[in-house]
Amino acid sequence: MADSADVFVKLPEGERIPQKIVELTGITDEQLKNEGITEAEASARFTELISGGRVLLVAHNAQFDLLFTAEMLRRHGNGGPEALKAADYLDSLTVYKDRRAYPHKLANAILAYKLEDKVQNSHRAIDDVAALFEVCKAMDAERSDLLSYVNVFGYNPKYGVSGKRIEKVAYWPQNFNKYMQAPSYTLPAKLRQRRR
């Protein structure tokens, strides 16, 4: 991890945090109002963070996060959309689905790799980033094939790809597995076989 940012983003005028989110995160409307920055400022900071060099963005269910982020960057410009397109992407959910049986939430990966004492599952972005970093390290130690998953996203064949497809990403249907897939049966291996 080269750099990080941990900021609150103010809600648009008149909007409030749903009570369920307050209960999950402990973040309140008052905190966002007093400690938050505007979405435009957050967009500019994120653009700066991912600009200038090779960038690998890692997320658990990256399709959702990338589309959400792309929309924010589009609203504010500043070169953000171009910087996001220039990055590469690793979807830890796709990797984890090749490693473990359902369910596949980040919390399940934390338990599977016995990281409960090392990370917090607080539903706060910075804690989720730290947890995801540790999960990825554990998956790499288990089998060092993470780079083969760069720009490869699995999706549930029952529902299809969620939202707009991202240009540089190869999408492939990915069923729930009952055990760790052999290297020749992982999603990247299936894509390589298809391209032959």
Give residue spans per PLM region.
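Conserved non-catalytic scaffold segment of RNase H-like nuclease domains
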Residues: 1-83, 108-123
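Acidic active-site catalytic centers that drive phospho-/nucleotidyl reactions
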Residues: 65, 91, 128
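Buried hydrophobic packing segments
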Residues: 69, 95, 132-136
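Hydrophobic/aromatic-lined pockets within catalytic cores
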Residues: 73-74, 100, 114, 134-141
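Short alpha-helix plus adjacent loop in nuclease-associated cores
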Residues: 87-104
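Short, structured loop/turn "capping" segments at alpha-beta junctions
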Residues: 102-103, 118, 143-146
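Acidic, divalent-metal-coordinating active-site segment for phosphoryl/phosphodiester hydrolysis
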Residues: 124-138
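Acidic two-metal-ion nuclease catalytic site recognized across multiple nuclease folds
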Residues: 134-196
